[in-house]
Amino acid sequence: VFHPEVDFDDRIDHKLRAEDLPIRVPSDKYERNIRAIRLLHQLEDENRLATESEQKLLADYSGWGGLSDRFDENHSDYEELKTILNPEEYTPARESTLTAFYTPPVVIEAMYKALENMGFSRGNILEPSCGVGNFIGFLPESMSDSKVYGVELDSLSGRMAQQLYQKQNITVGGFEETLFPDSFFDVAIGNVP
């Protein structure tokens, strides 16, 4: 459990709306990512969970897909990236520029609608490659009694998800390293790369 010292009732799960995730131009995406990373590092330095208003800033993080030019040493943002991202964050971020694209809200909502049509309303939900947790943030009210378990290999994205979805169980690491019991999940949902 992330920050076990914090009571469950004092935790906040961020709720996403489609308008919270517009398509952004690269410069805007970059600036929002940097703000979110600075805030994440501050929260970690202060050893605390994000407030509701801070979660809105963290939710602006959208990964590095489409931003490969920012990692070019001739780009004006290169030095800032090298300064803000520690070595354990920098290399995976650079390597993800061709693969880190998060699922659009319309797809997430359609997948949940399909689950509703199949009669699913509550249970243990697995999101095996959760990124920053967009599937968790779009969990419909009709499924709000469910418990979501997210797994994310990318440390930066997984740590963002832990701050955004404080009531859920987010594992930062490889799925093969998890210790979930057999037959524990009622449904798995996601858009694994």
Placement of each model-derived feature along the sequence:
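Class I S-adenosyl-L-methionine-dependent methyltransferase catalytic core
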Residues: 2-193
